[in-house]
Amino acid sequence: MLNNSPLYLKQDMVIRDEEYCRKNGLMGMSDTQLKAYPNAWRSWPRNYGGNYGDNSDIPLWNGLARSLNTIAIRVGDLVGASNIFNFVYNTLQLNTLDPVNDVGLAQMVMGSQTHGVTPTALAAAFQIFYDGQYTTPHLYTRVLDRDGNIYLENNSTSYQALTPDTAYVMNRLLKNVLYSSVGTAGGRYPNSNGMEAFGKTGTASDEKDLWFVGGTPYYVTAVWWGYDAPYDMTKTLGKQQAKTRTCVMAWKALMEQVQADLPYKAFPTSAGVVERRYCTQSGLLAGGSCTSTAVGYYRADDLPGTCNYSHAAAPAAAAPAETAAPEQAVIPADTGNLDTD
């Protein structure tokens, strides 16, 4: 059971109910006292704030926008922890990950890794949600001597990490974090000549590490907020303030400054992706009896079926209320490119 609750720290271990263990044959009177984590047999994962959800159906765009751990773990379980690890380690070059200890859902989905990743590596990884291309990160291109001769040259490499179809669908999914009313960074997109953006928030369970990765048609930026000596930032900020007034606001201010004089640019679309209205109750393409619909983005060769339900019950998840741009609720991207085993 402990293996299903992987996020406990060793210092959290306490002695549990020995009488219960003895009655159930788990230990004898002469056994050394057993130790287990608090609530070791609880359900896992929990969402930020400690809840497990309400057992209602939630479309993927909503779970991602709200940063629900339960939805993320479910998707990660479908893809497979080893497939995710192989993709991010080999294709996205996140080489600070541990091939022995970091192949698991807690590590790959929740970020509970042995050493973690750097902001540079994280920004490089998120660049694939522009057009699917990955370029090795570098801090300079070339160094010239006083005569104009090349003294140093950084030869970065580029390759296709995702198909353009998958990259565009993921781009639309991540846009909801900033533009949907339920997004963890809802309304905090840069005001940059009408250019769109995408992003993802991240918060450690002890509020000692805050993250935001944001992308625009020009830049991808990763922001980490914390202390060299880890400190619980909710001691000076509330939980919501820690999430919404730190990384994402710093990123928003930076993007508005660096993009102030840049001409308008749009994210590239993909000819293999189509827009369709879908039923927010069933997740299927909207049928004639669907009363609550939203726009989804789908691979043209992988459309879901059409909904034919009567919809007598209340909606499972309402259509997203946008904070600015038109609604952009989307369905999962193709995960076939992650199958690198």
Language-model-detected regions and their locations in the chain:
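Extended, hydrophobic alpha-helical segments in both membrane/secreted and soluble proteins
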Residues: 1-3, 23, 71-72, 84, ...
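Conserved catalytic neighborhood of penicillin-recognizing serine enzymes
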Residues: 2-84, 146-176
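A penicillin-recognizing enzyme superfamily signal
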Residues: 3-12, 62-66, 115-322
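Periplasmic/cell-envelope proteins involved in peptidoglycan metabolism and beta-lactam response
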Residues: 4-13, 82-89, 105, 253, ...
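Mid-domain, small-residue-enriched loop/turn segments at the edges of structured enzyme/sensor domains
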Residues: 29-47, 80-124, 137
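Thr-Gly-centered strand-to-loop micro-motif
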Residues: 74-75, 111-112, 199-200
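C-terminal catalytic domains of large/alpha subunits in multi-subunit enzymes
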Residues: 75-78, 86, 93, 281-285, ...
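Long, low-complexity, intrinsically disordered segments
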Residues: 325-341
